[in-house]
Amino acid sequence: MCKDFFIDTYQVILAKSFGADCILIILSAIDKMLANDLNISTLIEVHSENEAETALYFEKSLIGINNRNLKTLEISLNTSVKLSKILNSHRNPLICESGIYSAENIKFIVKNANIHNFLIGESLLKSHDIGSKLKDFAEINL
């Protein structure tokens, strides 16, 4: 997966040429994308109710709910809870993004948003023992 701030369709072509089979699209940053024409999967990232409603038009895409407000950088897991209610009719998996630091965070999202997929980056990268942290996440009993 290629995660970048896609602002031009050329970047989609470039990602595909480098072997990406999926790109992450921040819905607030784009109007239209070339991904479908290139047969590349898309992960549509949303943070607001309006973006969530728009994302439902991307029927073949995965949808990620970013708990981090990209304007203020504040994180709230309640974003996933709130937006999952709008997105519950989407036929593909939803992904909870940002703000996952512990088993309790994951259990909260599963219980309150019924999301079972997570994009975890920061808490792994900031961990002093990435392997141990990853093992802790993998062993969560839901």
Description of each model-found segment:
Residues 1, 21-24, 39-43, 61-64, ...:
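Structural preference for beta-strand elements that scaffold enzyme active sites
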Residues 1-26, 33-42, 50:
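Extended hydrophobic secondary-structure segments
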Residues 2-4, 27, 44-46, 67, ...:
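A cross-domain feature marking catalytic cores of carbohydrate-active enzymes
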Residues 4-5, 45-48, 73-79:
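A general structural motif
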Residues 12-32, 64-73, 113-134:
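Glycine-rich phosphate-binding active-site loops on the catalytic face of alpha/beta enzymes
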Residues 56-85:
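Glycine/Thr-rich beta-alpha phosphate-binding loop at enzyme active sites
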Residues 77-87, 124-142:
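C-terminal helical cap(s) of enzyme catalytic domains, especially alpha/beta-barrels
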